[in-house]
Amino acid sequence: MNIDIVCVGRIKERYLTDAIAEYSKRLSRYCKLNIIEVADEKTPEHASEGVGRQIKAKEGERIAKHLKDGAFVIALAINGKQLSSEELAAKINDLGLRGTSHIQLVIGGSIGLDDAILRRADFLLSFSKMTFPHQLMRVILLEQIYRAYKINAHEPYHK
């Protein structure tokens, strides 16, 4: 399975890059992982709704350039469907059984994803009704993908 994480912005914090590197290494046993970073837009403090839409549109255009025909696109969105770890594992397994060989997971920037990306997605996934920093979300997402593969392989890790 090919899995792309398409995300906005670069991560500068060492503790996050270390965690991303660790989960990327662990996942290499199970899938071909590719992390694609697109440039983020500077978001002014107290940006108006209109400015926010413009920022999301620019970031959305950059994301869209990396979305592949035939890939199953999962966008992370607060209004998406919440799944348990077991349900995410089953979803990944089912996609593979149905012949999907490429999954792309999209993480928006600090103000979220453009509506065009949300419409393009095949599935909207929410990790919580809470908001998380988009940089930290990469680590959380990678850990859950790793957990899903361990569940599907019936290997110890998941409790």
UniProtKB/Swiss-Prot annotation:
Assigned keywords, A-Z: Cytoplasm, Methyltransferase, rRNA processing, S-adenosyl-L-methionine, Transferase
Record GO terms (molecular function): rRNA (pseudouridine-N3-)-methyltransferase activity
Binding-site residues, S-adenosyl-L-methionine: 76, 108, 127-132
UniProt key word RNA-binding: no
Xref: SUPFAM superfamilies: alpha/beta knot (SSF75217)
Chemical reaction(s) catalysed: pseudouridine(1915) in 23S rRNA + S-adenosyl-L-methionine = N(3)-methylpseudouridine(1915) in 23S rRNA + S-adenosyl-L-homocysteine + H(+)
Coiled-coil blocks: none
Enzyme class: transferase
Protein's job: Specifically methylates the pseudouridine at position 1915 (m3Psi1915) in 23S rRNA.
HAMAP family from the UniProt entry: 23SrRNA_methyltr_H
Family: Belongs to the RNA methyltransferase RlmH family.
Name of the protein described by the UniProt record: Ribosomal RNA large subunit methyltransferase H
Organism this protein belongs to: Bifidobacterium longum subsp. infantis (strain ATCC 15697 / DSM 20088 / JCM 1222 / NCTC 11817 / S12)
Gene expressing this chain: rlmH
